[in-house]
UniProtKB/Swiss-Prot annotation:
This is Large ribosomal subunit protein bL32. It comes from Shewanella frigidimarina (strain NCIMB 400). The lineage of its organism: Bacteria, Pseudomonadati, Pseudomonadota, Gammaproteobacteria, Alteromonadales. GO terms for molecular function: structural constituent of ribosome. PANTHER family: 50S RIBOSOMAL PROTEIN L32 (PTHR35534), LARGE RIBOSOMAL SUBUNIT PROTEIN BL32 (PTHR35534:SF1). Residues 7-16 have a biased composition (Basic residues). Residues 21-31 have a biased composition (Polar residues). Belongs to the bacterial ribosomal protein bL32 family. GO terms for biological process: translation. Residues 1-34 are annotated as: Disordered. It comes from the Bacteria.
Length: 56
């Protein structure tokens, strides 16, 4: 089992954790239906970049 050589300070611990935060999902509004969807993904209606790509 690994054991640290020296104790890390609160400052160093915080600096390491500063990159761990999660970012919110990037949402886009579809041009045809006005629906929110994830970037670079097909909407629930089957539209992608203003064109129907999936027939339901």
């Amino acid at each position: 089992m690994a054991v640290q050589q020296n104790k890390k300070s609160r400052s160093k611990r915080g600096m390491r954790r500063s990159h761990d935060s999660l970012s919110t999902a990037q949402l886009s509004v579809d041009a045809t239906s006005g629906e929110l969807h994830l970037r670079h993904n097909v909407t629930a209606d089957g539209f992608y970049r203003g064109k129907k790509v999936i027939n339901k």
